[in-house]
Amino acid sequence: MPIPFEKVDLGYQKVFLAADAKKIMSGYNPESMDDRWFIYYEDSWVYFVRSWTGYHIFGFKLAVSPNGSANVIASWANRNIDEYQAKSKENDIQTINDLINGIFDVRSND
């Protein structure tokens, strides 16, 4: 599925240590039907895709420093109501944090 046309800037800001950034950039492939997310890194962007539908729900762009740490410099959330029923930007940011913490065991460095 393509990146959604209807999206909103999230203003998501995070700093990841080098080891954590590497984990995130390696992505995540669902292992079972219970896994609801597919996460991949492409052209400096991390994309969060619903594994069952293929819809892109969130994305954020990383600026990677020479030491390997990474800053989120742009972010968005899908606002196509046929693809994602958003509650709020705050809820979207919490969902991203929960996914990063749960899937990659990553804690932000900010």
Give a label for each model feature.
Residues M1-W45, E83:
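Negatively charged, low-complexity tracts enriched in Asp/Glu with abundant Ser/Thr
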Residues E31, Y40, W52-G54, N67:
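A generic structural signal for short, solvent-exposed coil/turn residues
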Residues Y41-S44, V64-A70:
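A short, structured loop/turn motif at beta-sheet edges
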Residues V46-V64:
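Canonical SH2 domain fold
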Residues S69-D110:
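Polybasic, proline/glycine-rich intrinsically disordered low-complexity segments
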